[in-house]
């Protein structure tokens, strides 16, 4: 078999007339003293910044395997000057975007709202914004507190987000036309102690699940994950249910990811806190029926899921599904991004080395119908800085497509990347 090589790698700007023009933007990444993995200071020269909100960068990736086949990765700023983008694709192939937008452009401003947009592939842009949050709130500068989104079988968009001042998660859903969102409502009453990171939400058919971590912050080894389940598209939810084992603990300031395997099976990936130091990536599968949990099981840990650390790493992870309904998890261990096919009984695998010796963080994953798997993340981050965008592309068989991405794209403060598959099988990346 002929090896896969990067035949063409060019970064181009897509203008309003969809013509392609070469660019050579170089952006400054300042030293990162808060990054515990970064051992050396570094400086990047800068000669230009992206100045137009919503400007699109295209990375054309020519991949050779016998005959030429071209995969395209469109790299685009989050619309509206927004940050913390979340992308999801529904069963019909529609791309949905959730993001936070500040009300004022001043650097010190924090207050704003969540907005939703649907991607219009024929026009290569997102549609008009629709406000999600009923009241404005201050953005959390940590990625772990990000909002989450899922799309149900009837077309409704379901959103959950975290407000630390209220020590509460809030939920809202759209109408089936996705033209407006209902008044936000609180999620937690019983298991609300020690909320310190974002919840996640999943949907399939008429089922919706909201999952979060809770418990005393001073006793991480006794925390666990909880959830509420709806079987009527979010109209009503179950009582709050304990879903995880308290024997494993739960890292207080790491977010989690959840996804439905089928209408009665929920996958939850979260970081434990065994004896306060075993911050391993746990893969929990919960079986339930009629809003009641019937059973739960943990998958055996592989080496790359294990992380001994006495402090909280403030990490995030992401789950998506391929064309064969296999669930894929991307996560961080010791400053490196890893990938794992859930339920396959195989070990987690590393993704790629960083540009320089520094920390990789906040991964997202998207998989097209051919099985090509794109993983994106940030590097040289801090608590507030998004860092430098990096990515890696894998073929369906796990082989490395080695796109050779070397672009210097700076992720905005407080933000992280997101990825989705376009209807034509190409990829969209927001930052």
Give residue spans per PLM region.
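Bacterial N-terminal signal peptides
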Residues: 54-66
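Short hydrophobic targeting helices and cationic amphipathic motifs
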Residues: 18-22, 26, 33-37
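Bacterial N-terminal signal peptides that target proteins for export
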Residues: 40-57
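Short alpha-helix boundary/capping segments
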Residues: 1-10
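Repetitive helical segments and hydrophobic/amphipathic motifs
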Residues: 10-13, 22, 26, 64
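Position-driven detector of the extreme protein N-terminus
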Residues: 2-3, 28, 40, 90, ...
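Extracellular, repeat-based ectodomains that mediate carbohydrate processing or recognition
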Residues: 70-431
